[in-house]
Structures are given as structure tokens and as C-alpha cells.
């Protein structure tokens, strides 16, 4: 009964079709869409809408009525249900997308039921009669490009999502030409696997890659290439994809790697331009994916609708009756009941030839695209640029690369360049009232001024961007990912880095540096020790204690020698003239240079004072002369050194060099956690630095600091128990800032420079380098350093390298001299008292007085100068003046001089 009813319905539909000209006014078409194809669905809807609403004066219009299903390709039962649902609705053709899991199910149903499938998905490897491939094959174009580049050794990365057609073609060509191809399937790779693979290939010096993957996987691979820094100059990537402009390649632009690919859609054609105008007006909420330009798969989807519409027009012109398709049919019938007009539909589809968004759309008898043209693009500094095209007839044709470097520069001048830097005094700092400013005006510092000068010389606009992680740039040993400002350049987030960024080998491998704008080295910062207090006898410091001991021995020795030569020389002996009324000269001629007088003479000469006696003999005068010469040199040297020692404050530093740090354990030391200083110690082969690195790496708690400011703060708080290793420029700057409690010790451990960095191969590199050289020749770099280091210093002049400061003398500097003066005066008073007592005792015996009486008489005489009670003047027996006279006799060969002494 059901069969009879179905036949009646079909018969009625046939008569209705004949009455309406054998062609329905509404054509049922199907649509099968898989996950992540929102933009393709938008293009599908837009194409149908434009067809149904566009006037056509030459032919009677007909509407396309879509029946759309979203399929989950992982579930073959769901795919079958979706197709059967389309078939049961009486669709004349199906537009659908598939992947490797659903392709065989869909193509099998199409072949069995004679329902044509128009698809923008990857071409199938076998021959499917009722499948029309909108996507052209890349095999011929890719092989032509490999021949052009003359690659004979490269890596081929692929997945199985699109089959093995390109892999087979490349391996066949490799066998014919002797190519060495490393084919690697990356279907099951994750991010870590990608990075490990890329590092391994880099160790094998693999620099050329062909990547044949769908857009989602392709984009992930490119991100991992950037993350390990393989997107720089020296690498070449060919992307086996028809949407070169659909791929995000901004970071590769800055990296400098050569990237080549294919572009199916020419956005300069009138048809594409017109559609783009309409595309931009779509409501993004109603048409998801319309916020971005249509991908090549969306363009193929649009062309697929045009192909179906043109096919129905052709069928109507041929008066082929397709109205008997109806809305009945069981796709699971056994045996299968194919659609009777399916052959006519499939034949007419393959005969269609139109101009679509992807150029000429034409098929061979296998349903594959023929007579198509695809453009060849390369990535330039200004973005993707067409360098040629490929088609079946002409093969690869390269066109002249008209744009020049000047145009690249002009393009740079017309946009704002991102300048990455780091908050580090005095290079980049916030102004005190930075909240009142916007953009670059919020910052000040050496690098801010330098960026302004470089921009003036190059003629660019720029925007300062502070690096988010606050690091200079180092590569993680495990993930191989660069951080800091180097990472900003490597991964295309910035175009210039103007900061205290040290030029190193590992950085130079992934970015370009200008000539150094500042020279420096690694130095040691410690907390400034307390000023050493001068000792009581600091006046002795100008001469070593050994010298003082030698002077004492010399003094004694000279006195003894003078005594001896005076004893042996006859010219030192003389007689004294007797006073009137006295007896003649004594039998013992006097000699003035006894041991005490010799000591007194030597002391007077040393103190550069005089003496009331002088040598008479030649030998004595020789001794006196050499002693005077000796004292002249010693006193002059002492005086010269004394001025410096008493007027200069000295600070005793516990550390003076890296060797001092390495051989002690009391003072900890460390570096910045991510930077060239840490890398210097890690890579150093010098024994001292290796020992220091071993300590720093294993020290607990960690001696590495996140920022320079943190390291300086740690030095200040450690009470002299932490030393920070950093660039000398920062060390000198910090020494000039309050609270003025840090200092640089020792010399620089190495010699290096700061440079302005640009991405590898960037067109800005040469211009920046020339600007730095020009600024250096003009002396502006030195002016900037003086401005931010010393002119704005807060600790006074004197230079960062000086540890001594000249100051006025304090009492502590000369206290010892006063002590000696007071001690000498006290000693003199004591000796005078002893002499007073001794003489009083002698006078008491001589005058037959008591000791107390003699003492009183002596005291009265000392105080008042008056006579005593007995009328006699009590005076001490002072030596009388010596008067020389004539020799009156000779005894034992000695000339005796008359004297007045008894």
C-alpha cells in the first residue's frame, strides 16, 4: 500500500512539473557542515541570499532552498542520519564539508544514491564519480616551487587529515631527483612534542621546511616555531595551503624568516572587492565569522553555491526534468535505489564553468578543478607580497618584485612602531606626576631620550611598551621559550628594544643588535663600610712601622757614631780659659760630645731645630752632614704623606675583587635571575667564575633577584653580608643615589656593551644602527649619560670609582700629637720636680740645713727670686760660659785650652 501511495505522489509531482515547465521554482539543496566552520556557513547563507534576491532579466528566477545539518564527524551513525535526512527531503545536490573520519561515509552514499556532493574540503585520493572538488590540488604548484628553490634536503611536516597525495608526490620526486626528505607526521603532537621536534631538527641544522596541514594545526605549528625562536633569518618555510593571507604571520614578519605560500583568492579582483563590501556590512551576531575577512574555504563555499545555481540554470536550459526527485527516498534501502536524474545532475555539474571568488571554476570528468591559477606569496617586512603565480599551462611564473626597500621604509614611517623597554632607573622611569600624562610622555630617563633621538633620525612614530614580565631576556632551558624583551622581539610583539640590553652571543642568534650605545662590564656592589676612625697615633701612618723602627735605630746609631768619632778625633778636645783670679786649666780637657750631648744633637737635627753645640772635627761634621741629609729626605716624605693621610677619610672594604668573593663564605653574592650577568657566570670557563657560579647555583636561600632594584635593596639591608653582581653603569648610578650607602669595588669582570635590538632581519635594523653611530659621533650619548648619572646625582661629586673623600681635619686625626705634647709637658714637670728635690737635698747638705729649709729657700727663689733669711742668695750651680783661650801647655800630645772653671 505504501509503495502504491508513493507512486501516486511521484506521478502527481511529474504532472505538476510538466505544468510548470518541468522545472521547479524552488530548488532543494542540502548543506552539511562540520565543527569550526561558522564562517563557511555564513558564506553559504550569503551566497544563497544574494542568488535569491538578485534580479535576472534573461531567465525566470528560481530560489535555492537549503536544508542544513551540522554533523559530528567522529560519530559515523550521526553522519549517516544527517545524509539520509538530506536525501529524504528531496534535495537535488548537497554542499558539504568532511574530514578524514567522514569522507568515506559521505562519498559512499553519494555514489550509491547518485546524489552529487560539492565540497571545499581536501581532494580525495580515489575517483569518486558524484563528488566535485572545489579545492584545487597543490601537488603541481608545490613541486614547481621546490624545483625553483632547488631544495634537495628539507623537512616535510604533514598530518593525515588531508590524505597522503602531496606526500606521495614529494617522495616520488625525491626518489627521481635524489632529494633527502625527512617526512614527519605530526598528527598526534602536542605543544611540548612540537618544541622537542623543532629543537632536534635544529641540532641537525635543518633550516628548510614544508608544512602540509590544515589551518588549525598549521597555526599551532607556527606558534611553536615562534616559541623556540626558529622564525628568524636563515629559516625558510613553505606552507602547503591555499590561504596564505588567512594565516597569522605577524611574528614571522619581525623574525625575518623566509615564508612562502599560495593564495587562491585574489582580493584585488572586482568580484571579490564587491563581495568584501557586502561582507563587512553583515551583522556579526547573525553571521558568525563575518568579523574577519573570508578564508579561502569560505570563498570556495561561496563558489560552490554559484556552481549549483549555474548547474540548475543549465539543466533548465537543456529542459532536463529533475522534478521527479520528489521528497521521498530511503537511503538505506537494500538494494540501493539511486536517483534517476542523478547522472544528468552530475554530468551538468562537471560541465559548469564560471568565474568565482577563487578565479576560474572548472572541473574535469573526475570532478577535480582544472584551469585554475594560484598566486605565490612571500612574507616581506610589510606583510605578504605576491611574487608569482602558478597554473597548469605556464607552471610557475615569477614576476618582478617591484616594491623596493624605500617603500618598506615608507611603510614603516606611516605606522607606529612598538618600542619595548624595561622600568629601570635611570634608563626608564615614571615622571613624578605621570598620572597627568599619556603615552610616551609618562616616562623619562636615558633610554626615553635615546628613543626620541633615534626616532628623529629614522623618521618614525613610536610607542613605548613596558615589558610585562620585567625581564631582559633569557631562554628557558626546558621549554626553549624566550622571555623578557628578547621574547617580545622574537615573538613579534615589538619591533625595537631600547633598554640596557646587553649584546650577547645567544641573543645575537635570534635578534639583531646595533653598535653599542654604552660600554660597561660586570662589577661588584657592596654596602658602603663605615668610615674608619683614625687612631690616637694616626700621625705615624704616613710611614710604615718598619721605617719608624729603622729611624729609631738610625738615631741611636748616629748618636753613638758621633760620640765615638768625637772621642777619637783630637779636634773635638779643647781647654777652657780660666776666669780672673782662678787657677789655670784643668788637667782633663773637656769634650762637648758626650753621649747625652750626641743624642741631643741628633734629636735636634732630626727635629730640624738647632743645637748650641756643633762638631768641630771633620769626621764629626761628616756624621752631622749625612744625618742632616737623611732627616731632610725622611721629614719631606713624611710631610707629603701626612697631608694626604690626615685630610682623606678612608673606608676599609672587606671585598676588593671577585677573587676575594670567591675565597670567602661570610658574604653572599648573586646576580639578576634573568640576564646577561647570570649567563656570563653560567658559561664562563675561568676557574674563579666557575667557582662563583657553583656557589650561586646551589646557595640557599637563592641569591638571584628578580629585578635590579631588589638586588640593590638586598645589599642595603644585609649589613654588609651580601654583594650584588651587576652592570657597572647601574652600579655607578646607584652609588650616586640616596641614601648613598652602596659602592663599587674592584674593576670590571668583563667588557661588553648595550645595544638597540631589532628582530632578526628587520628593515629597521640598519637605520637604527646608523642612528646610534651618528648620535655617538655627535657626542650626544655622552651628554645623556652625564645628564642622568652625574648631573642628577644626589651624593655629591667625586666620581663613582673613588672610595676616599677629602675633608677637614678633626681632633681625632691629630689627637696623638696633643697626647704627646701633654705627656711631654707632664714629663718635663716631673723631671723638674725631681731636679728640684735633688738640688734641695744637695744644698741642704752643703749649707748644713734641713731638707725642709733648703726646699723652702729653693721654692722662694724659684717663685720670687728673693734671697733667703741668712742674707745669701741661693742659686743653683749653673755652668759658666765657656771662653776659649790660648793653649798654655801640652800633655800627652793634647792641646789644652785655658778655662775659668775650677
Swiss-Prot record:
Bridged cysteine pairs (disulfide): 84-331, 740-795
InterPro entries linked: ANF_lig-bd_rcpt, Glu/Gly-bd, Iono_Glu_rcpt_met, Ionotropic_Glu_rcpt, Iontro_rcpt_C, Peripla_BP_I
Residues the record lists as Phosphoserine modifications: 862
Lipid-anchored residues (S-palmitoyl cysteine): 611, 837
Residues bearing glycans: 52, 56, 258, 371, 407, 414
Secretion signal span: 1-20
GO cellular component, one term: terminal bouton
The protein's name: Glutamate receptor 4
Protein source organism: Rattus norvegicus
Amino acid at each position: 500500500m505504501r509503495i502504491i501511495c508513493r507512486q501516486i505522489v511521484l506521478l502527481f509531482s511529474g504532472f505538476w512539473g510538466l505544468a510548470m515547465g518541468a522545472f521547479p521554482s524552488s530548488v532543494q539543496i542540502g548543506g552539511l557542515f562540520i565543527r569550526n566552520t561558522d564562517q563557511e556557513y555564513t558564506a553559504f547563507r550569503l551566497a544563497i541570499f544574494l542568488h535569491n534576491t538578485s534580479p535576472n532579466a534573461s531567465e525566470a528566477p528560481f530560489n535555492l532552498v537549503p536544508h542544513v545539518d551540522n554533523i559530528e564527524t567522529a560519530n559515523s551513525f550521526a553522519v549517516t542520519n544527517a545524509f539520509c535526512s538530506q536525501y529524504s527531503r528531496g534535495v537535488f545536490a548537497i554542499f558539504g564539508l568532511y574530514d578524514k573520519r567522514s569522507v568515506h561515509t559521505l562519498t559512499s552514499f553519494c555514489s550509491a544514491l547518485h546524489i552529487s556532493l560539492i565540497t571545499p574540503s581536501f581532494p580525495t585520493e580515489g575517483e569518486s564519480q558524484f563528488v566535485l572538488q572545489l579545492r584545487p590540488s597543490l601537488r603541481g604548484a608545490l613541486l614547481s616551487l621546490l624545483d625553483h628553490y632547488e631544495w634537495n634536503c628539507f623537512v616535510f611536516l604533514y598530518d593525515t587529515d588531508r590524505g597522503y597525495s602531496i606526500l606521495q608526490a614529494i617522495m616520488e620526486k625525491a626518489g627521481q631527483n635524489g632529494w633527502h626528505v625527512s617526512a614527519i607526521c605530526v598528527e598526534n603532537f602536542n605543544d611540548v612534542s612540537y618544541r622537542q621536534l623543532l629543537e632536534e631538527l635544529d641540532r641537525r641544522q635543518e633550516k628548510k621546511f614544508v608544512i602540509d596541514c590544515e589551518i588549525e594545526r598549521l597555526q599551532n605549528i607556527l606558534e611553536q616555531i615562534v616559541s623556540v625562536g626558529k622564525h628568524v633569518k636563515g629559516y625558510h618555510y613553505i606552507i602547503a595551503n591555499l590561504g596564505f593571507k588567512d594565516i597569522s604571520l605577524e611574528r614571522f614578519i619581525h623574525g625575518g624568516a623566509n615564508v612562502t605560500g599560495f593564495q587562491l583568492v585574489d582580493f584585488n579582483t572586482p568580484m571579490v572587492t564587491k563581495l568584501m563590501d557586502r561582507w563587512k556590512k553583515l551583522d556579526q551576531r547573525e553571521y558568525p565569522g563575518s568579523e574577519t575577512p573570508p578564508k579561502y574555504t569560505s570563498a570556495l563555499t561561496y563558489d560552490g553555491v554559484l556552481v549549483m545555481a549555474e548547474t540548475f540554470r543549465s539543466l533548465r536550459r537543456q529542459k532536463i526534468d529533475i522534478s521527479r526527485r520528489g521528497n521521498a527516498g530511503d537511503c538505506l534501502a537494500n538494494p540501493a535505489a539511486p536517483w534517476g536524474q542523478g547522472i544528468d545532475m552530475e554530468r551538468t555539474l562537471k560541465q559548469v564553468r564560471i568565474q568565482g571568488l577563487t578565479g576560474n571554476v572548472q572541473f574535469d570528468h573526475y570532478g577535480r578543478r582544472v584551469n585554475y591559477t594560484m598566486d605565490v606569496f612571500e612574507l616581506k617586512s610589510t606583510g605578504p607580497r605576491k611574487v608569482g603565480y602558478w597554473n597548469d599551462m605556464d607552471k610557475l611564473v615569477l614576476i618582478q618584485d617591484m616594491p623596493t626597500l624605500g617603500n618598506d621604509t615608507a611603510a614603516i614611517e606611516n605606522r607606529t612602531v612598538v618600542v619595548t623597554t624595561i622600568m629601570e632607573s635611570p634608563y626608564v622611569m615614571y615622571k613624578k606626576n605621570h598620572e597627568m600624562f599619556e603615552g610616551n610622555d609618562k616616562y623619562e630617563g636615558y633610554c626615553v631620550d635615546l628613543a626620541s633621538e633615534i626616532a628623529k633620525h629614522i623618521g618614525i612614530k613610536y610607542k613605548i611598551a613596558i615589558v610585562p614580565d620585567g625581564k631582559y631576556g633569557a631562554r628557558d632551558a626546558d621549554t626553549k621559550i624566550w622571555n623578557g624583551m628578547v621574547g617580545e622581539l622574537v615573538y613579534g610583539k615589538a619591533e625595537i628594544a631600547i633598554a640596557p640590553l646587553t649584546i650577547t652571543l645567544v641573543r645575537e642568534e635570534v635578534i639583531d643588535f646595533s653598535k653599542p650605545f654604552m660600554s660597561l662590564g660586570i662589577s661588584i656592589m657592596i654596602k658602603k663600610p663605615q668610615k674608619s676612625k683614625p687612631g690616637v697615633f694616626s700621625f705615624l701612618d704616613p710611614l710604615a712601622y718598619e721605617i719608624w723602627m729603622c729611624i729609631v735605630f738610625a738615631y741611636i746609631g748616629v748618636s753613638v757614631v758621633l760620640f765615638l768619632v768625637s772621642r777619637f778625633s783630637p779636634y773635638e778636645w779643647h781647654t777652657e780659659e780660666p776666669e780672673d783670679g782662678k787657677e789655670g786649666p784643668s788637667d782633663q780637657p773637656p769634650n762637648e760630645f758626650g753621649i747625652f750631648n750626641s743624642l741631643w744633637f741628633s734629636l735636634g737635627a732630626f727635629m730640624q731645630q738647632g743645637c748650641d753645640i756643633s762638631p768641630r772635627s771633620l769626621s764629626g761634621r761628616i756624621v752631622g752632614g749625612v744625618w742632616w741629609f737623611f732627616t731632610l729626605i725622611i721629614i719631606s716624605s713624611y710631610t707629603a704623606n701626612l697631608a694626604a693621610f690626615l685630610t682623606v677619610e678612608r673606608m676599609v672594604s672587606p671585598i676588593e675583587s671577585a677573587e676575594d668573593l670567591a675565597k670567602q663564605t661570610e658574604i653572599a653574592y648573586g646576580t639578576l635571575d634573568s640576564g646577561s650577568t647570570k649567563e656570563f657566570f653560567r658559561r664562563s670557563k675561568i676557574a674563579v667564575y666557575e667557582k662563583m657560579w657553583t656557589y650561586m647555583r646551589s646557595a640557599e636561600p637563592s641569591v638571584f633577584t628578580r629585578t635590579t632594584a631588589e638586588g640593590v635593596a638586598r645589599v642595603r639591608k644585609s649589613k654588609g653580608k651580601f654583594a650584588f653582581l651587576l652592570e657597572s653603569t647601574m652600579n655607578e648610578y646607584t652609588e650616586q643615589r640616596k641614601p648613598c650607602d652602596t659602592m663599587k669595588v674592584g674593576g670590571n669582570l668583563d667588557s661588553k656593551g648595550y645595544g638597540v635590538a631589532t628582530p632578526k632581519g628587520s628593515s629597521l635594523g640598519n637605520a637604527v644602527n646608523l642612528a646610534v653611530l651618528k648620535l655617538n659621533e655627535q657626542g650626544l650619548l655622552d651628554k645623556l649619560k652625564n645628564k642622568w648619572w652625574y648631573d642628577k646625582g644626589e651624593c655629591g661629586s667625586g666620581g663613582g670609582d673613588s672610595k676616599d673623600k677629602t675633608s677637614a681635619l678633626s681632633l681625632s686625626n691629630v689627637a696623638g700629637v696633643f697626647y704627646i705634647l701633654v705627656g711631654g709637658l707632664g714629663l718635663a714637670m716631673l723631671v723638674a720636680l725631681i731636679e728640684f728635690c735633688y738640688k734641695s737635698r744637695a744644698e741642704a747638705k752643703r749649707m748644713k740645713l734641713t731638707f725642709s729649709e733648703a726646699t723652702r729657700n729653693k721654692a722662694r727663689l724659684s717663685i720670687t727670686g728673693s734671697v733667703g733669711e741668712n742674707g745669701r742668695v741661693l742659686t743653683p750651680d749653673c755652668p759658666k760660659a765657656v771662653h776659649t783661650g790660648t793653649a798654655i801647655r801640652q800633655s800627652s800630645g793634647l792641646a789644652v785650652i785655658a778655662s775659668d772653671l775650677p
